[in-house]
Amino acid sequence: MASSPHKHYLDEDFDAKEFIETYFSHGKISIIEEHVGFPMKVLHEVFSSGKVRGDALLDISVGAIIYQLFSASNNFKKMYVMEFKDANITHFKKWLQKEEGATDWSFVSEKFCHIEGIRDKLQEKDQVRKAIAGVIKWENFENTPIDTQLVPEVDCVLSLWMLAVISKTKEAFQTNLKKFTSRLKIGGRLLLFLGMNVLL
């Protein structure tokens, strides 16, 4: 995911639902396939291999997206979702608590069931919800590490697109990457999806 279209991600007037519907659910088919279809297929292959599993996973992905958690919920007892913006946390919790105004992720459930070869879409969504142990705000992320009181050590850190969005320079990218993995256990796994224009 290119970072330039999302340069206003951290602005105060950021619209969480509009962001999702533009890039992840109601946009052009080619964009949806790049941002949703491709990661889901890759994550299915990774998690179904059985090599990435454990007690806890930390997700630090862009926006209030949920599709990356479907395959992960098969392999981890607890999943922690971390965000920087109140708007995204509020919108994510609408889906989590089945509230009115939440993004309709039915197409993700259907795609996941097709990939996994299963039929019960409702059961899968409930499995994801039950595995989410916390939705946590990372306060002042630019200047502070992840709060060790809020997030335990985890077996896997999963991040889709976020580093590309918040890192304006190579140095910022390296600093943010260290922060993202600060709660990762020794021997744990990092699953990272980046934009094509990220300078490494």
List each model region and its residues.
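S-adenosyl-L-methionine
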Residues: Q97-I146
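A short glycine-rich, Lys/Arg-flanked "PGG" loop and its adjoining helix->strand segment in the class I
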Residues: L150-V151, E171-I186
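Class I SAM-dependent methyltransferase Rossmann-like catalytic core
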Residues: M1-G54, Y67
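A short acidic, Gly/Pro-enriched loop at the edge of an enzyme's catalytic core
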Residues: E142-V157
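Short catalytic micro-motifs in class I SAM-dependent methyltransferases
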Residues: E139, L158-V165
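Conserved SAM-binding loop
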Residues: F92-K93
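Acidic carboxylate diad motif detector
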Residues: L192-L194
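Conserved class I S-adenosyl-L-methionine
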Residues: V52-I65, K78-E83
